[in-house]
Amino acid sequence: MRAQPKASHFIDGEYVEDAAGTVIESIYPATGEIIARLHAATPGIVEKAIAAAKRAQPEWAAMSPTARGRILKRAAELMRQRNRELSELETLDTGKPIQETIVADPTSGADSFEFFGGVAPAALNGDYIPLGGDFAYTKRVPLGVCVGIGAWNYPQQIACWKGAPALVAGNAMVFKPSENTPLGALKIAEILIEAGLPKGLFNVIQGDRATGPLLVNHPDVAKVSLTGSVPTGKKVAGAAAAELKHVTMELGGKSPLIVFDDADLESAIGGAMLGNFYSTGQVCSNGTRVFVQRKIKEPFLARLKERTEAIVIGDPLDEATQLGPMVSAAQRDKVFSYIGKGKAEGARLVTGGGIPNNVSGEGTYIQPTVFADVTDGMTIAREEIFGPVMCVLDFDDEVEVIARANATEFGLSAGVFTADLTRAHRVADRLEAGTLWINTYNLCPVEIPFGGSKQSGFGRENSVAALNHYTELKTVYVGMGPVEAPY
């Protein structure tokens, strides 16, 4: 098997195996080939990982932020040196095209290590508060053992987005990747050890639905950060709430992307395509409800159809390929069921909706699909599909489209395309979403906070704001005179 790791888990600085765990097969989505076979963590493996993290964390927390940051910056250097190797592994693990992974996956993980490694000394500070003769000061202190639970769309990036702020803040982490994409996080753990990270601080264990509760409910875990679906997020948040654990939830969305009639048409179409077809549509922040002002609807659709049908679909390891397969057969079948619902409920199929002709029969491919004449009540306009399916809806005016855009349980992202920047900012203020883009879409540099509102989650990944979710504030009051007591 061409991507078989040394063992299933990485604990306390070394690979660990326990063949008693349920078998997890990593499948290359383009061909159906089994590229690795691993085992889910047994309760004993979970205990071993958490114990290693708990043992290593206090000494790590006692180091200066500068010293911790230096190690993370070295890890970033190593990731960049091995970008090709890591990108090919990510492509095998997920099915995403190499032309995408080589610029967007390990590189964004390296950016995260570099950013947090550099910003920590200045960001992990407190305040001095004069109180007359007395004074107080505050300091940010680490939480302890943190659990990261990843999704299968950006496995290496998510491991770094959670690991970097947790580690630089002085915590230890046990990270569980998705069972669909188990390989990349193991390489991140290897690189961190090579960069000088003390053993036990970043542990990776494999698992399935039975593993998550063992981690979330463990009494030594102080924090859980999840990237996943809304139903999973509710279960994890509920379990964490029972023990008052800290949580960050980055969940799903059904985000609106609004195109006004004065927008640059090519840019708006490009933004809509990036917000629906990048990573084969498997991006939580995708703008899958594309509201197009009625005046430009048909020109928009005509050009969108032309550009969509020119997308190169094929072998993800071919650098000419622009769109790869879905991550799994189960996800492909789920997306096809939504396409069927769109047709049945009266949406107009503009393009796509089937299997490409030029691909392996064992691959989990779907044509990029565009529906028009979609109405707000249709299933494809209400539920997260998580595949390359774009819904185009008509609108007439600003007030109407804002109300319709907000009429959803989700609130992860939103986008606005218009030449009128005054209107752009006004609309952005009124849209109920945690992350918004104006005249672009789905750009998430590490310098800016990323996260949602409503049922799309809470807390933020990236930027200095993320450090607040991996630390808590300690206040110290210093008395400078005798204590006055009425006793």
UniProtKB/Swiss-Prot annotation:
Annotated positions binding K(+) 2: 244, 454, 457
UniProt xrefs under PROSITE patterns: ALDEHYDE_DEHYDR_CYS, ALDEHYDE_DEHYDR_GLU
Matches recorded under Pfam families: Aldedh
Single GO biological process annotation from the record: glycine betaine biosynthetic process from choline
Coiled-coil ranges from the UniProt annotation: none
Cofactor(s) essential for the protein: K(+)
Pathway in which the depicted protein is active: Amine and polyamine biosynthesis; betaine biosynthesis via choline pathway; betaine from betaine aldehyde: step 1/1
Top enzyme class: oxidoreductase
Binding residues for NAD(+): 150-152, 176-179, 229-232, 252, 284, 384
Record-listed Cysteine sulfenic acid (-SOH) modification sites: 284
Catalyzed chemical reaction(s): betaine aldehyde + NAD(+) + H2O = glycine betaine + NADH + 2 H(+)
Residue sites binding K(+) 1 per the record: 26-27, 93
GO MF terms held by the record: betaine-aldehyde dehydrogenase (NAD+) activity; metal ion binding
EC number: 1.2.1.8
Keywords: Metal-binding, NAD, NADP, Oxidation, Oxidoreductase, Potassium
Free-text comment on the cofactor: Binds 2 potassium ions per subunit.
Keyword Isomerase: no
Residues annotated as catalytic: 162, 250, 284, 461
Keyword NADP: yes
Function: Involved in the biosynthesis of the osmoprotectant glycine betaine. Catalyzes the irreversible oxidation of betaine aldehyde to the corresponding acid.
Assembly, per entry: Dimer of dimers.
NCBIfam families cross-referenced by the UniProt entry: BADH, PRK13252.1
The family this protein is said to belong to: Belongs to the aldehyde dehydrogenase family.
Name by which UniProt lists this protein: Betaine aldehyde dehydrogenase 1
Organism: Rhizobium meliloti (strain 1021)
